[in-house]
Every structure is written in structure tokens, then in C-alpha cells.
Amino acid sequence: GALGYFFMMQELGRQLKEQDIHPRYLVASSGSLGTFSGMWLGAKYFNVGLEVVPVAVDPLASCREVPAADLINRTSKKYGLGLTCTPEELKINLSYAGLGYNIPDADTQEAMRILASTEAIFVDPCYTGKSFRGYLDLVQNVFAHGDGAIYLHTGGIPAIWTKEHLDSMQDRFWN
């Protein structure tokens, strides 16, 4: 996963430059750290100028900065990128992880509903729903006005249609 998101950052940087867009933040889900590690490396290596903001999907993911730094450093070394980082340089946001892995809370479900009803874009309850919830809150309450932020939808749509998640969403919005 890390290498794919490393090259995704190259493409994103190219598109931002072509369109003369200058956001400050890139918000995305963070689980096993491959996505975040690749984006961090790509942002630095390709000088994209974005601060990558990983939103954890599991509240038990505390102290993930140490393994993330290890993955970043090993990937950089393996591919000769010449980049290193320390755990102190990384900040994984645990504020929106909810009750547990694959357990959406009411705030996550509401964020899912907002995005689906306003933009016809679906996010899943495990990963992208939680990170989109974080994105909404960060843009509205944390990031400085005018800084600009990108939300990266990393997939996960099939999780919406599991019986557990369907029942939960139906109970919340249609009963």
C-alpha cells in the first residue's frame, strides 16, 4: 500500500500545480499505516506541500507513530528515497476513531449521511466514514479559515452493505 500512495502523491502534486490550487492539508483514513506512510513519503519526496493528516479508524491505535516512522524509514531505504522521519514528526489523529474498529458511532453515521445526501458520494462505516467525520470537524473547527484541505476517499464501499451496518443505518435513519 505504501508505494501506491507514494505515487498517488506525485499525481496529486501534478494536478494541484496544473490547476494552481494550494491547499495546506490532506486528510485520509489510517489503519495499518501503509496509506499514511506512502502519502507522507510522497508528499516529502515530490515536494507536494501538503501536511498529511491521518485519521485513525481504531481508538486502540495509540502510539502508532512509532511503527509508522519505522515503515516510512524502511520503505525509504528500500527504494533509495533518502528520506527519514522520527515518531515525533508524525501525528495520527485518534479523535474520530469512535468506539472501535469497524464500529461506527452516531457522529460517523451522520457524516456518512451528509456526504451521501449533499454530494452523492458514499463512504463506509469503518474507514472513510470515520475519516470524513474527522475532515468535516477539522475544516469547521480546527484548520484556519482559508488554509484549504483535501479529503482523500480511499474506497471501502462494500462495507456499507454488510448486514450489521445496513441494520444500524436503517435503525438510525429510517425507523
Each predicted region: which residue ranges?
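Glycine-rich phosphate/pyrophosphate-binding loop at beta-loop-alpha junctions
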Residues: A2-K91, H153-N175
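Short, high-confidence coil segments that cap the C-terminus of an alpha-helix
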Residues: I21-P23, A144-D147
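General beta-strand structural signal in soluble alpha/beta enzymes
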Residues: A28, F122-P125, Y151
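Active-site-adjacent helical/loop segments in soluble small-molecule enzymes
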Residues: P87-G146
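Compositionally biased, low-complexity repeat tracts
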Residues: K130, Y151-L152
